[in-house]
């Protein structure tokens, strides 16, 4: 847990980036206004987390999940954000699923490559053994001819 109230503030760089993305080009914001928005955002996050935690506790869980956050948004009377949040959550889940599938495919491809390399190595070893046998047979034949 935070030891000082300042520890609860969101990073200034993040707040500044969000503000710049939200404002039209050419619009500036004072340091004081940026600080006020930062504090307001921090309070909002803390309040939303507290509300979501209440839903988790009702469900006898210690871990907050997305449905807790969505329920908290409704309880805080931010219903108009629920649909965009659900859409963002679905996009996030699709992205994570795609990453997971890509990772699994990469692992399968790597395993196939490793298996193929092992088969090639085994074939090479078999060929080396065959060559050694042929050389040995040739030497034996030469020795027999000499005898």
UniProtKB/Swiss-Prot annotation:
GO terms of molecular function: chromatin DNA binding; DNA-directed DNA polymerase activity; protein heterodimerization activity
Keyword flag Coiled coil: yes
Residues the record lists as N-acetylalanine modifications: 2
Biased composition, class Acidic residues, residue ranges: 125-147
SUPFAM superfamilies to which the protein is assigned, alphabetical: Histone-fold
Entry-linked Gene3D superfamilies: Histone, subunit A
Tissue: Expressed in heart, brain, placenta, lung, liver, skeletal muscle, kidney and pancreas.
Keyword Transcription regulation included in the entry's annotation: no
Main localization, broad class: nucleus
Basic and acidic residues bias spans: 93-124
Single biological process term from Gene Ontology: chromatin remodeling
Coiled coil: 85-146
GO cellular component, one term: ATAC complex
Region (Disordered): 93-147
Subunit structure: Component of the DNA polymerase epsilon complex consisting of four subunits: the catalytic subunit POLE and the accessory subunits POLE2, POLE3 and POLE4. Interaction with POLE4 is a prerequisite for further binding with POLE and POLE2. Heterodimer with CHRAC1; binds to DNA. Component of the CHRAC ISWI chromatin remodeling complex at least composed of SMARCA5/SNF2H, BAZ1A/ACF1, CHRAC1 and POLE3; the complex preferentially binds DNA through the CHRAC1-POLE3 heterodimer and possesses ATP-dependent nucleosome-remodeling activity.
UniProt protein name: DNA polymerase epsilon subunit 3
Organism this protein belongs to: Homo sapiens (Human)
């Amino acid at each position: 847990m935070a030891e000082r109230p300042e520890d609860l503030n969101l990073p200034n760089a993040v707040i500044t980036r969000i503000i710049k993305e939200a404002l039209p080009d050419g619009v500036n914001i004072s340091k004081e206004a940026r600080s006020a928005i930062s504090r307001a955002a921090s309070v909002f996050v803390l309040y939303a987390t507290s509300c979501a935690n209440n839903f988790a506790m009702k469900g006898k869980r210690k871990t907050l999940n997305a449905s807790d956050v969505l329920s908290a948004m409704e309880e805080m009377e931010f219903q108009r954000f629920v649909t965009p949040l659900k859409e963002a959550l679905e996009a996030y889940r699709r992205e994570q699923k795609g990453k997971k599938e890509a990772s699994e495919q990469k692992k399968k491809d790597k395993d196939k490559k490793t298996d193929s390399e092992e088969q090639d190595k085994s074939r090479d070893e078999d060929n080396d053994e065959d060559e050694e046998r042929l050389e040995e047979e040739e030497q034996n034949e030469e020795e027999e001819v000499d005898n």
